[in-house]
Regions:
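Pyridoxal 5′-phosphate
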Residues: 1-416
């Protein structure tokens, strides 16, 4: 059920115990590292505790009441995930440890069965290492080639370059692209890219780790073939990821991990695999945290993803106006908030990002500094690292003001 009007952020903040913390002695926590992970509401914490306190059991196996209750709650989360991204069926939803494992599953299972020598896989310069390294491993193993779509100086992908790769006589075997950059905040026009790719018969993987938590994502409308994302970036626990795969593709893919629960029958020299999606979920899964993820989805649904996006746009516009007025600051990525999410990466003068993050921490402000697992993009930007502030539903304009005040103090301290 969607709330009416703008988000009541101060009411939302009451649901997050950690936001009552203080850093550096007496400084209220200003948490601006949401692109790395988000904080957890009480509903999620309580759902996990409830499992361990009241119906802790393995799933899909025993017939006793605890097992049946645990299985029911686990599978309820799969249903919630399918509805959240508008998947056709729960059979299209595979639980993994994280988005990284989800992309590796595609590379290992689909990739090793389909990619051949001299084939090409197309990715982009904005990718997280999770959407680079698996393809490097695969192309190296298969004698295939990895191609990169570049970005312009404003952080937009060069779509003509992308089109050229698709039109080349050496046809690409697969495209894998982030829906939203974890550094630039760029929202990639994946709908258009998927359509262009499908016109050439090329399947597309979408890394939705930064988009699914922040906006309404509809995999059927988007028509992607694969999508990966993580629970912990959308109020859920760590250790849970999701891989969505179109069923007609998933049915042809070999298993990723062998073991219990992904089988129907095992004999000395042969095995009959389980039905979808269990064929890809070998071993005891992260039951408690999958159940906690279900509570996180309920929480976001109660707010409404359109409201989440509206709040972040408003906050990002406010922050961009403030930060671009600070002397010596360079902001990376699009300045039009229609084209970017709630992520602002920046540098200020010659202050090292780690030094800046330390000063921020002294003011109670938690930001990220470093290469953000995107060293290919850092090379494109010609920097070793950046500082990054990223927003979510519980952040306020007052917190942005604290962040900017700390930034101004750093500027004065370093005489910029």
């Amino acid at each position: 059920m969607m709330q009416k009007g703008a988000l009541n952020v101060h009411k939302i903040r009451e649901d997050f115990p950690i936001l009552k913390r203080k850093l550096s002695g007496d400084k209220p926590l200003v948490y601006l590292d949401n692109a790395a992970t988000t904080q957890k509401p009480l509903a999620v914490i309580n759902a996990i505790s409830d499992y361990y306190m009241n119906y802790n059991s393995n799933i899909h196996r025993a017939v006793h009441q605890l097992a049946e209750e645990a299985t029911l709650e686990f599978e309820k989360t799969r249903e919630k995930v399918a509805k959240f991204i508008n998947a056709k069926s729960t059979e299209d939803i595979i639980f993994t440890r994280n988005a990284t494992e989800a992309i590796n599953l595609v590379a290992y299972s689909w990739g090793r069965a389909n990619v051949k020598k001299d084939d090409r896989i197309v990715i982009t310069e904005i990718e997280h290492h999770s959407n680079i390294v698996p393809w490097q491993i695969l192309t190296s193993e298969k004698g295939a080639k990895l191609e990169y779509v570049g970005t312009d100086d404003d952080g937009y992908l060069k779509l003509q370059e992308y089109k050229n790769y698709l039109d080349s006589s050496m046809k690409a075997k697969l495209v894998s692209v982030s829906h939203m950059s974890n550094v630039l905040g760029t929202i990639v026009p994946v709908d258009d890219m998927i359509k262009m790719s499908h016109e050439k018969g090329i399947p597309v993987v979408i890394d939705g780790a930064q988009s699914v938590p922040h906006m309404h994502v509809d995999v059927q409308r988007m028509d992607c073939d694969f999508m990966a994302f993580s629970a912990h970036k959308m109020l859920g626990p760590t250790g849970v990821g999701v891989l969505y795969v179109k069923q007609e593709i998933l049915e042809k893919m070999p298993p990723f991990i062998g073991g219990g629960d992904m089988i129907k029958e095992v004999h000395k020299y042969e095995t009959r695999y389980n039905d979808l999606p269990y064929k890809f979920e070998g071993g005891t899964p992260n039951i408690a945290d999958v159940i906690g993820f279900g509570a996180a989805i309920d929480y976001l649904n109660n707010i409404g993803m359109d409201k989440v996006r509206e709040h972040e746009v408003e906050l990002t516009e406010y922050a961009l106006d403030k930060i671009t007025a600070v002397k010596g600051v360079t902001v990376y990525g699009p300045h039009n908030t229609k084209d970017r999410g709630g992520v602002i990466s920046f540098n200020i003068g010659d202050i090292h990002p780690h030094d800046l993050a330390t000063i921020m921490n002294d003011h109670g402000v938690a930001i990220r500094s470093g290469h953000h697992c995107a060293q290919v993009l850092m090379e494109r930007l010609d920097v070793a690292a950046t500082s990054r502030a990223s927003f979510y539903i519980y952040n306020t304009k007052e917190e942005v003001d604290v962040f900017i005040s700390a930034l101004e103090e750093a500027r004065r301290l370093f005489k910029i």
